[in-house]
């Protein structure tokens, strides 16, 4: 990778992390920085963006950023959005093709992370799209994780979306 490409990736990632929509647009449209340019840490702007900024996500995705990019631990932007509870960002990612059934390095789907953190609205959104029979590295399904946490509201949501496996 060329030093110029890394510097461009650093600038784009920095602007995305700060939530600076104008700078992200300038870099993408005027300087023609590729939306999946890697920064010096091997991450894209979508991976390091300020998750509360759906405008950043939209701009990057409209310019061709991959919604399914994973870091070395297997974490993708949908994992991060689910874990941190940013439903609006998660919806934007899914609308642009993010796969909610790709596990991270621990075998967890985004819904496992949302259950673990107690993000009810995120669990409700993901339940219809997720493989609820998928087990994480500890062998737990999202429902079993909710039961283990004693989170009855999440248990109710998940049970409402359960379909018997074939």
Curated annotation (Swiss-Prot):
Keywords from the UniProt entry: Acetylation, ANK repeat, Cell cycle, Cytoplasm, Nucleus, Repeat, Tumor suppressor
Cysteine pairings via disulfide bonds: none
Annotated positions of the N-acetylmethionine modification: 1
Signal peptide limits: none
KW Ligase (keyword) present: no
InterPro entries recorded: Ank_Repeat/CDKN_Inhibitor, Ankyrin_rpt, Ankyrin_rpt-contain_sf
PROSITE patterns in the cross-refs: ANK_REP_REGION, ANK_REPEAT
Main subcellular location of this protein, as a coarse class: nucleus
Entry's Gene Ontology BP terms: autophagic cell death; DNA synthesis involved in DNA repair; negative regulation of cell growth; negative regulation of cell population proliferation; negative regulation of G1/S transition of mitotic cell cycle; negative regulation of intrinsic apoptotic signaling pathway in response to DNA damage; regulation of G1/S transition of mitotic cell cycle; response to retinoic acid
Function: Interacts strongly with CDK4 and CDK6 and inhibits them.
Protein name per Swiss-Prot or TrEMBL: Cyclin-dependent kinase 4 inhibitor D
Gene: CDKN2D
